[in-house]
Regions:
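Active-site YXXXK catalytic motif of short-chain dehydrogenase/reductase
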Residues: 92, 143, 147, 151
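C-terminal substrate-binding subdomain of Rossmann-fold SDR/epimerase-dehydratase oxidoreductases
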Residues: 21-24, 50, 201-327
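Conserved Rossmann-fold NAD(P)-dependent oxidoreductase catalytic core, especially the SDR/UDP-sugar
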Residues: 97-144
């Protein structure tokens, strides 16, 4: 009989891709989310539209599942999470606590939790040429307001459910996941998708808006690398949080250049210093993931962004979002 897995957040970007990955592995997969996938039908055998802030809905979602992959969260890009600290923190704490308890009640064998690099202390991320963050850097804690603190609390809840109830929890700290079929507009999009959208809408020689001075640095992880890492972490015997990210550091300005090159356009950057830009620099130290999992990301930022841009441009053209004459 096939192993069964629940993927919460299956209507979202990472969850949607993870469902397909697990189905291809031979799992019977149930997706659960407050919405269905936006850009393509789910690959899973089941999909439940549920509000996981409600404990009763979490019990429905987790019933009969061998493994739980918990990705559901109220989140978005830097603009959204900096303007909605209270809602983000409250909603996500409810979802996390409810899903852990529902998994325990229904006897799930494993529980994967998607944490975030936003848990890392702000005092370690004040320079663009940042030292890559290793897992032990999380404490003394000084997480990002709202989203970062609630993700750190979620990690602690997982630790308590492992120690108190024997639920085999596994934790990944995501570093800026991107790729096709991710939200690219509406206010919840992340920087890679937002840049792809802006470039797709621009004519050769146009200006495009860049939030901040563009010299803030990040590492970005392609979705195929992410879902492979999720599975390896979930199936491992390692109970502590692990970074799941690329260690290829880039500036936001360079990200714009990479996408512009993929589009064959020469564009002028117009920097808006009034917009939120997050921490000054962040990169992932993948030493522990290599040691424990043998996992290394395989997709470069140039290849991943080109692939992402082509998907966003094609989708926008298909729905009529790209004006005539823009190519």
């Amino acid at each position: 009989m096939a192993q069964s897995a629940l993927v919460t957040g299956a209507g979202g970007f990472i969850g949607h891709h993870l469902v397909k990955y697990l189905v291809d592995k031979g799992y019977h997969v149930r997706g659960a989310d407050i919405k269905r996938p936006e850009y393509a039908p789910t690959s899973g055998q089941e999909f439940e539209v549920l509000d996981l802030r409600r404990f009763e809905d979490c019990l429905i979602a987790a019933r009969g599942m061998d493994e739980v992959y918990h990705l559901a969260a109220d989140m978005g890009g830097i603009g959204y999470i900096t303007e909605n600290h209270a809602d983000v923190a409250r909603n996500n704490v409810l979802i996390e606590a409810n899903m852990l308890e529902a998994a325990r009640i229904h006897g799930a064998k494993r529980f994967f939790y998607s944490s975030s690099a936003c848990i890392y202390p702000l005092y370690l991320q004040e320079q663009p040429e940042v030292t890559p963050l290793k897992e032990s850097d999380a404490y003394p804690a000084d997480a990002e307001p709202g989203y970062g603190w609630e993700k750190l609390y979620g990690e602690l809840l997982c630790r308590y459910y492992l120690s108190d109830h024997g639920l085999e929890t596994r934790v990944a700290r995501f570093h800026n996941i991107y790729g096709p079929e991710g939200t690219y507009d509406g206010g919840r999009e992340k920087a890679p998708a937002a840049i792809c959208r802006k470039v797709a809408l621009a004519r050769d020689g146009d200006e495009i808006e860049v939030w901040g001075d563009g010299e803030q640095t990040r590492s970005f992880t392609f979705i195929s690398d992410c879902v492979e890492g999720i599975y390896r972490i979930a199936q491992s015997d390692y109970p502590e949080p692990l970074n799941l990210g690329s260690d290829e550091l880039t500036t936001i300005n360079n990200l714009v250049d990479v996408v512009s090159a993929a589009a064959g356009k020469s564009l002028i950057k117009r920097h808006d210093l009034s917009k939120p830009q997050g921490v000054r620099g962040r990169n992932s130290d993948n030493t522990k993931a290599r040691e424990v999992l043998g996992w290394v990301p395989g997709v470069s930022i140039a290849d991943g962004m080109a692939h992402t841009y082509r998907w966003i441009e094609a989708y926008m053209q298909r729905v009529g979002a790209v004006p005539a004459g823009v190519a």
